[in-house]
Amino acid sequence: MKTTYVNATIVTMNEQNEVIENGYIIVENDQIIDVKSGEFANDFEVDEVIDMKGKWVLPGLVNTHTHVVMSLLRGIGDDMLLQPWLETRIWPLESQFTPELAVASTELGLLEMVKSGTTSFSDMFNPIGVDQDAIMETVSRSGMRAAVSRTLFSFGTKDDEKKAIEEAEKYVKRYYNESGMLTTMVAPHSPYTCSTELLEECARIAVENQTMVHIHLSETEREVRDIEAQYGKRPVEYAASCGLFKRPTVIAHGVVLNENERAFLAEHDVRVAHNPNSNLKLGSGIANVKAMLEAGMKVGIATDSVASNNNLDMFEEMRIATLLQKGIHQDATALPVETALTLATKGAAEVIGMKQTGSLEVGKCADFITIDPSNKPHLQPADEVLSHLVYAASGKDISDVIINGKRVVWNGECKTLDEERIIFEASRYKRGLQR
């Protein structure tokens, strides 16, 4: 099946960050086979031609760190620092989860993400009360591209920890698929919730199965102080001593990194999932993304969960990411629009090991989203496309979402998830949680 999308303004995010006015994209099954400017002559003998009527077409956004199973917890635990938020709000509520509630919560997060332009994401879920196979089936049904990872903790007894490691290894062996729509990573929660032995076992699993690692690291000053007091090392050095960086690793946050740590992480191919809104809301601080990029680190933007954000809008994350860097450095050139877009598309895709997506180029997967600026005053005049995408647009502006060549959202309607049912069930399950 060959389909051509014509009469579009195409934000390619190729090496030149080329924007093609009045262009077209030809998709064959799940791949892009041509991207050009001008009128379409049907040289490829396509099956269908779709007039985009001047819509902006850009790569699907890539969320490098989130927790979709937590989506029912939106608005619970506002105005709290990370540790009391986790210990007195999030973990007690997660302990009440059931498989049915977890699926309902996941569906809500998936619906919000895909309708706001996210096509790929990397996720960590707490396995308490969760049917991991049901979660993977739910993500698959959404049509999204994802790395969904089972989180490990050292809570409970040593036998509990051993069982958690065994279950996580089975999960990795079952779901790791480097080139598929769904895959997984090895995901120890953090250095303050995992024992040294557990972190070492996670490193072993990652090396033996050739997977990536996903971990919360250097998120707060308190974490750095506590880990240094307990182990005599800062979190980066401690994680390295456990062997975690033997495989490409995504660290969520990286708010508290010094110059030497940034250089070390760049050298060891450790990438950062930057969560600006979540870090601000939890009072964790502001990650120095400008310095990370200058050190050669790979960085991708992320939302974290709705419980700490409180939405999954990647456009909002792009905007706050660039504004924060300009503000803390007092440098208006810090993180310009092209870089912000890169960190939410092809750069983010590279961070989570999904190089097959993130730009609109021949050979890439057909993952793209559209915005119709014609009826949106906040996107007019419509000639400064890149600027408007970062500084003016929002996830609410999305018209269409194509993932792997399939129309997942069309004219604002999600084709893979039942929006009315999901919203109804989210409210019903939320009422059953005891605060």
UniProtKB/Swiss-Prot annotation:
- Which superkingdom does the taxonomy of this entry point to? Bacteria
Single GO term (MF): metal ion binding
Q: What keywords are assigned to this protein?
A: Hydrolase, Metal-binding, Zinc
Report the catalytic activity.
S-adenosyl-L-homocysteine + H2O + H(+) = S-inosyl-L-homocysteine + NH4(+); S-methyl-5'-thioadenosine + H2O + H(+) = S-methyl-5'-thioinosine + NH4(+)
Pfam families, from UniProt? Answer: Amidohydro_1
Please give the family membership noted in the entry: Belongs to the metallo-dependent hydrolases superfamily. MTA/SAH deaminase family.
The protein in question is named 5-methylthioadenosine/S-adenosylhomocysteine deaminase
Which organism does this record belong to? Bacillus cereus (strain ATCC 10987 / NRS 248)
